[in-house]
Curated annotation (Swiss-Prot):
Single GO biological process annotation from the record: antibiotic biosynthetic process
Gene encoding the protein: tylE
Pathway connected to this protein: Antibiotic biosynthesis; tylosin biosynthesis
Keyword field contains Methyltransferase: yes
Name assigned to this protein: Demethylmacrocin O-methyltransferase
The entry's keywords: Antibiotic biosynthesis, Methyltransferase, S-adenosyl-L-methionine, Transferase
Statement: the UniProt record of this protein carries the keyword Methyltransferase: yes
InterPro entries documented for this protein: MycE_N (IPR040800), SAM-dependent_MTases_sf (IPR029063)
Function: O-methyltransferase that catalyzes the conversion of demethylmacrocin to macrocin, the penultimate step of tylosin antibiotic biosynthesis. Also able to mediate the conversion of demethyllactenocin to lactenocin.
GO MF entries: demethylmacrocin O-methyltransferase activity
EC number in record: 2.1.1.102
Catalytic activity annotation: demethylmacrocin + S-adenosyl-L-methionine = macrocin + S-adenosyl-L-homocysteine + H(+)
Knockout consequences: No production of demethylmacrocin.
pH effect summary: Optimum pH is 7.8-8.5.
Amino acid sequence: MAVQKEATLVRQIIRAAGGHAADVRELVAEHGPEAVTAVLVDEIVSRAPHPVNDVPVLVELAVRSGDALVPRRLAVAQGAPVRRAAPDDDGFVAMRVEYELDELVRELFGPCRERAAGTRGTTLFPYATSGTGHIDTYFLAAQQATATVLAGCTSAKPDLNELTSRYLTPKWGSLHWFTPHYDRHFREYRNEEVRVLEIGIGGYQHPEWGGGSLRMWKHFFHRGLIYGLDIEDKSHAEEQRITTVVGDQNDPGCLTELAARYGPFDIVIDDGSHINEHVRTSFHALFPHVRPGGLYVIEDLWTAYWPGFGGDSDPGKSDLTSLGLVKSLVDSLQHQELPEDSGRSPGYADRHVVGLHVYHNLAFIEKGVNSEGGIPGWIPRDFDALVAASSGGAA
């Protein structure tokens, strides 16, 4: 119940951050500064990059809402992620960063905006009686640690290439080179309250591996809710804005139930088993639950050629593979141009696939209303007849 309440609060904060400042203040009045600040600190910790300061320090976040001041200290040191400092942590506070609560809400969860100044206050060595005595030991660490924490306080678009390395997901730099394509097709969704489903959380049967790409999408879509589906229990990957579900991507009933609970989705990414039958089942079950204007993505098309995944090394025998599915969508796009006596009855994909972008091992399928209309029947289908009809009778 507490987890559900927290998830609801996160969604409310995201919604308010995209509205007027008054919406944020009403939310804070309802839930209290402490509860809202807890959500914000959790987000900052998850977004902050790996610290580089070799001298451990504390950075104090002081979040103000009217007369209330909520201080939270973060421990920052090379070799470990940024974390909340324990109550008895007596480390050196190198910097105090003060935000207005409604301003920090909008910085973290509102539509991305560029503001070079005027968003926060800072105090170097806030509790030291004399700063000069600490310069040699803590000055550089203060600068580095503050930069790390402030990097977690922004919604500026991150570098997907860097995120793949940070979160240990092979979407760029090793097996694949997907991130430039993802950046191109996903950037327009960054400021929206998206719901992203990724099939396949990673780590196979290891109980503590996987979840890197979910964290990457959480960081990239700073206003989004991220869902991961896997045949194995990957609940260790759950955190604020990330939900994992145990299920079989080859079970249409499971997928329909998942979509009914968490959809409709703005984006679905199939990075699951890569077994061709599973890819096709997932598409047919989930594409109807992608909202108009959304995207369905299929990774690792190479398995279409591998018999061990249900593929076929002969490209001419690809009908039952993932690539066979992608190729069929070209006909779906053009279905209104087929002769009326073709005997083809338009299916769901025919009516709703409006764009197709295929790269090496990666396909993006755009969802919409595919009913622009075909070339009218009174237009001649024969070249010579078309020329004659279009020439006004001129010989």
